[in-house]
Swiss-Prot record:
The modification S-nitrosocysteine is found at C599. Residues 230-246, 256-269 have a biased composition (Acidic residues). This is Heat shock protein HSP 90-alpha. The gene is Hsp90aa1. ATP binds at N51, D93, K112, F138, R401. Its EC number is 3.6.4.10. It comes from Mus musculus. The modification N6-acetyllysine is found at K58, K84, K444, K459, K490, K586. In the resting state, through the dimerization of its C-terminal domain, HSP90 forms a homodimer which is defined as the open conformation. Upon ATP-binding, the N-terminal domain undergoes significant conformational changes and comes in contact to form an active closed conformation. After HSP90 finishes its chaperoning tasks of assisting the proper folding, stabilization and activation of client proteins under the active state, ATP molecule is hydrolyzed to ADP which then dissociates from HSP90 and directs the protein back to the resting state. GO terms for cellular component: apical plasma membrane; axonal growth cone; basolateral plasma membrane; brush border membrane; cell surface; cytoplasm; cytosol; dendritic growth cone. It catalyses: ATP + H2O = ADP + phosphate + H(+).
């Protein structure tokens, strides 16, 4: 084996090298990692830092019951040491370390339960970045390394070295190198084309992206050069003394790490010789920079955090150029422990409701280790605009998506997040200006919530805002509407439509406005779905003014008059129903019209005109539903209108008057249009109107037209409803 020949050059006193074969599934996984192209190789560093963090968690946990466990090293930290000369990247932690048995079992001979599952997921097209969720994150090192060396020291064992170039086997030997005290050092011998991971900028970028909120300091050691100005001999001597002192301190503090990067003694001697001649010299030094100084903001006390800090964190989290609109920072303790920080952005993303869109934008951490940012079970889809982090103390670090779906802990977290989001919106509603901005961007989400979330429907309904017939240019809540209701008013009246002007001028609101009853204008397509679920508010039923059975507050006298009108027009209603046949379910005398002659209303459980329009616009609509949901139309006539009164007299004078049919059909089609419906055959309706115009202008149907070509067109025009239809139109006066 190449590993063994390598180790034969080692000093004689070293113990014999043992070679082990990788367990079959692990060998297969490594081969898959090495031989497949992955674009996001950078995740190897996240996995190794997470492993270090786990090891540090373990020793910290053990030290709680036995403080002497930390005698081998009190400081808990992670160091990253890139070396361009050796083409190695070293990750050192002062965690619990591994015994010889741990090394052999954990890194090669015993497959984790997730190994096979992860390989299957990979072959099915899963992202390599999921590797940590299957407990095999260590092997991601081979995405960038041709050889990996692991040196480790556990309190209960000697220091050992594990090494493998992934050729199906690995070696383990006692390590006689620099004593570690306690912990693990992973040395990655990088592939030739992966040297970007030795660049200071690249390492910082990856740590910031993936491991910014690890609970232990991550320090990057970089060898740098600096210019040194020398003014005269005295200053030179003074500087030399200071340098020696600094060098001694550094050697005593960071000996192992500095040796990893490479000793600088020769260079220092060389410099000492050059210094006398030059005024300006170059000096090498090891720069140490802590990369995750920002303690996870969500672990701090909310009282100690300024709005600016929240703003900076929000921008770094979301890459948004604007400040957030609102923030909610809270922790839950008791049987379950987690912290969360939630933000409402100022504007909705342009692809908020796209299917391919991530279902949520909340990052899930487990004990400060980032797990995933697309956990669908964390928050309902209607809140997918909320940004933030959730950090759980109870979820296992190697949790998979399947486990998350079943997790009871996650269900409790989700319930709390929804509750806190609604609290946040309610707080936001107290500030009219900010709530207006919020509502403009996210009202659809609130309405979608009412449609989907039955548990929180009541709270969500309090967040709704609408224009009404009495609100002018200001949107009001349902609560405001209820405070303005008339004494004998039992219902909340609303109308759905396309625009505010269209619904305000609708025939349906005439009588209500005359009576001084306020009508809510619902002018977004989603309102139709929302109101199907929102049956009532504070004990008051929501009633559509475009549907049958509209009850208006009436006194006894009004009721009596209405009954008389019904009797008077009963015969006309019957005649109209016979003419319209299946087009309408029934024709009745209306109590909602004032200036319009008639209108089309729908049955209580059928679609409104607006809903029918929306459904017809669906590309993937179900035509079978269209049939029974859209067919229930009722024609209501206004008994006080001169057109209806004259039509009644005409029908009663001569039951066989052929012009009555055309007038009824014309009235029906016009009512369809004014009530918001579309015509099935607009051309026939147009021809009917043109004939009426001709009659109005006194033009005889048989008169030749001015232009021969247009005469030809007239001749070719199809009859309206058979030949007898034409003769009836001619009889219209």
């Amino acid at each position: 084996m190449p590993e063994e020949t390598q180790t034969q050059d080692q000093p004689m006193e070293e113990e014999e090298v043992e070679t082990f074969a990788f367990q079959a599934e692990i060998a297969q996984l490594m081969s898959l990692i090495i031989n497949t192209f992955y674009s996001n190789k950078e995740i190897f560093l996240r996995e190794l830092i997470s492993n270090s963090s786990d090891a540090l968690d373990k020793i910290r946990y053990e030290s709680l019951t036995d403080p002497s466990k930390l005698d081998s090293g009190k400081e808990l930290h992670i160091n990253l040491i890139p070396s361009k000369q050796d083409r190695t990247l070293t990750i050192v932690d002062t965690g619990i370390g591994m015994t010889k048995a741990d090394l052999i079992n954990n890194l090669g001979t015993i497959a984790k339960s997730g190994t096979k599952a992860f390989m299957e997921a990979l072959q099915a097209g899963a992202d390599i970045s999921m590797i940590g969720q299957f407990g095999v994150g260590f092997y991601s090192a081979y995405l960038v390394a041709e050889k990996v060396t692991v040196i480790t020291k556990h309190n209960d064992d000697e220091q050992y070295a594990w090494e493998s170039s992934a050729g199906g086997s690995f070696t383990v030997r006692t390590d006689t190198g620099e004593p570690m005290g306690r912990g693990t050092k992973v040395i990655l011998h990088l592939k030739e084309d992966q040297t970007e991971y030795l660049e200071e900028r690249r390492i910082k970028e990856i740590v910031k992206k993936h491991s910014q909120f690890i609970g232990y300091p991550i320090t990057l050691f970089v060898e740098k050069e600096r210019d040194k100005e020398v003014s005269d001999d005295e200053a030179e001597e003074k500087e030399e003394k200071e340098e020696e002192k600094e060098k001694e301190e550094k050697e005593s503090d960071d000996k192992p790490e500095i040796e990893d990067v490479g000793s600088d003694e020769e260079e220092e001697e060389k410099k000492d010789g050059d210094k006398k001649k030059k005024k300006k010299i170059k000096e090498k030094y090891i720069d140490q920079e802590e990369l995750n100084k920002t303690k996870p903001i969500w672990t701090r006390n909310p009282d100690d955090i300024t709005n600016e800090e929240y703003g900076e964190f929000y921008k770094s989290l979301t890459n948004d150029w604007e400040e957030h609109l609102a923030v909610k920072h809270f922790s839950v303790e008791g049987q379950l422990e987690f912290r969360a920080l939630l933000f409402v952005p100022r504007r909705a993303p342009f692809d908020l409701f796209e299917n391919r869109k991530k279902k949520n934008n909340i990052k899930l951490y487990v004990r400060r280790v980032f797990i995933m940012d697309n956990c669908e079970e964390l928050i309902p889809e209607y809140l997918n605009f909320i940004r933030g982090v959730v950090d759980s103390e109870d979820l296992p670090l190697n949790i998979s998506r399947e486990m998350l779906q079943q997790s009871k802990i996650l269900k409790v977290i989700r319930k709390n997040l929804v509750k806190k989001c609604l609290e946040l919106f309610t707080e936001l509603a107290e500030d009219k200006e900010n709530y207006k901005k919020f509502y403009e961007q996210f009202s659809k989400n609130i309405k979608l919530g009412i449609h989907e979330d039955s548990q929180n429907r009541k709270k969500l309904s309090e967040l709704l805002r609408y224009y009404t017939s009495a609100s002018g240019d200001e949107m009001v809540s349902l609560k405001d509407y209820c405070t303005r209701m008339k004494e004998n008013q039992k219902h909340i009246y609303f109308i759905t439509g396309e625009t505010k002007d269209q619904v305000a001028n609708s025939a349906f609101v005439e009588r209500l406005r005359k009576h001084g009853l306020e009508v809510i204008y619902m002018i977004e397509p989603i309102d139709e779905y929302c109101v199907q679920q929102l049956k009532e508010f504070e004990g008051k039923t929501l009633v559509s003014v475009t549907k049958e059975g509209l009850e208006l507050p009436e006194d006894e006298e009004e009721k009596k008059k209405q009954e008389e009108k019904k009797t008077k027009f009963e015969n006309l209603c019957k005649i109209m129903k016979d003419i319209l046949e299946k087009k309408v379910e029934k024709v009745v005398v209306s109590n909602r019209l004032v200036t319009s002659p008639c209108c089309i209303v729908t049955s209580t459980y059928g679609w409104t005109a607006n809903m029918e329009r929306i459904m017809k616009a669906q590309a993937l609509r179900d035509n079978s539903t269209m049939g029974y949901m859209a067919a229930k139309k009722h024609l209501e006539i206004n008994p006080d209108h001169s057109i209806i009164e004259t039509l009644r007299q005409k029908a009663e004078a001569d039951k066989n008057d052929k012009s009555v049919k055309d007038l009824v059909i014309l009235l029906y089609e016009t009512a369809l249009l004014s009530s918001g419906f579309s015509l099935e055959d607009p051309q026939t309706h147009a021809n009917r109107i043109y004939r009426m115009i001709k009659l109005g202008l006194g033009i005889d149907e048989d008169d030749p037209t001015v232009d021969d070509t247009s005469a030809a067109v007239t001749e070719e025009m199809p009859p309206l409803e058979g030949d007898d239809d034409t003769s009836r139109m001619e009889e219209v006066d």
